[in-house]
Amino acid sequence: MIHPGHILFLLLLPVAAAQTTPGSCSGCGSLSLPLLAGLVAADAVASLLIVGAVFLCARPRRSPAQDGKVYINMPGRG
């Protein structure tokens, strides 16, 4: 369950971001376009790898039939 304090923090985060003055970061450099594109591409690849791993782990596995027999539930036979 999410703690109510966390929800309040998430709601107030845009307000705090709006209060900061632009250029208040000392020593921060701007990101070049190739670096930004590389970060976005790496994030997309990492996301696809995570989705693939979850898909492989979550899909149902087929159990092999024993001795070539398949069990079929047929009431009344027995």
From Swiss-Prot:
<dbReference type="InterPro" id="IPR009861">
    <property type="entry name" value="HCST"/>
</dbReference>
<keyword id="KW-0732">Signal</keyword>
<comment type="similarity">
    <text>Belongs to the DAP10 family.</text>
</comment>
<protein>
    <recommendedName>
        <fullName>Hematopoietic cell signal transducer</fullName>
    </recommendedName>
</protein>
<dbReference type="GO" id="GO:0043548">
    <property type="term" value="F:phosphatidylinositol 3-kinase binding"/>
</dbReference>
<dbReference type="GO" id="GO:0009986">
    <property type="term" value="C:cell surface"/>
</dbReference>
<keyword id="KW-0325">Glycoprotein</keyword>
<dbReference type="GO" id="GO:0005102">
    <property type="term" value="F:signaling receptor binding"/>
</dbReference>
<keyword id="KW-1133">Transmembrane helix</keyword>
<dbReference type="GO" id="GO:0050776">
    <property type="term" value="P:regulation of immune response"/>
</dbReference>
<feature type="topological domain" description="Cytoplasmic">
    <location>
        <begin position="56"/>
        <end position="78"/>
    </location>
</feature>
<comment type="subunit">
    <text>Homodimer; Disulfide-linked. Heterohexamer composed of four subunits of HCST/DAP10 and two subunits of KLRK1. Interacts (via transmembrane domain) with KLRK1 (via transmembrane domain); the interaction is required for KLRK1 NK cell surface and induces NK cell-mediated cytotoxicity. Interacts with PIK3R1 and GRB2. Interacts with CLEC5A. Forms an CLEC5A/TYROBP/HCST trimolecular complex depending almost solely on TYROBP. Interacts with CD300H.</text>
</comment>
<feature type="topological domain" description="Extracellular">
    <location>
        <begin position="19"/>
        <end position="34"/>
    </location>
</feature>
<feature type="region of interest" description="PIK3R1 binding site">
    <location>
        <begin position="71"/>
        <end position="74"/>
    </location>
</feature>
<keyword id="KW-0472">Membrane</keyword>
<feature type="transmembrane region" description="Helical">
    <location>
        <begin position="35"/>
        <end position="55"/>
    </location>
</feature>
<keyword id="KW-1015">Disulfide bond</keyword>
<feature type="region of interest" description="GRB2 binding site">
    <location>
        <begin position="71"/>
        <end position="73"/>
    </location>
</feature>
<keyword id="KW-0812">Transmembrane</keyword>
<feature type="signal peptide">
    <location>
        <begin position="1"/>
        <end position="18"/>
    </location>
</feature>
<keyword id="KW-0597">Phosphoprotein</keyword>
<dbReference type="GO" id="GO:0051897">
    <property type="term" value="P:positive regulation of phosphatidylinositol 3-kinase/protein kinase B signal transduction"/>
</dbReference>
<feature type="modified residue" description="Phosphotyrosine">
    <location>
        <position position="71"/>
    </location>
</feature>
<dbReference type="GO" id="GO:0016020">
    <property type="term" value="C:membrane"/>
</dbReference>
<comment type="function">
    <text>Transmembrane adapter protein which associates with KLRK1 to form an activation receptor KLRK1-HCST in lymphoid and myeloid cells; this receptor plays a major role in triggering cytotoxicity against target cells expressing cell surface ligands such as MHC class I chain-related MICA and MICB, and UL16-binding proteins (ULBPs); these ligands are up-regulated by stress conditions and pathological state such as viral infection and tumor transformation. Functions as a docking site for PI3-kinase PIK3R1 and GRB2.</text>
</comment>
<dbReference type="Pfam" id="PF07213">
    <property type="entry name" value="DAP10"/>
</dbReference>
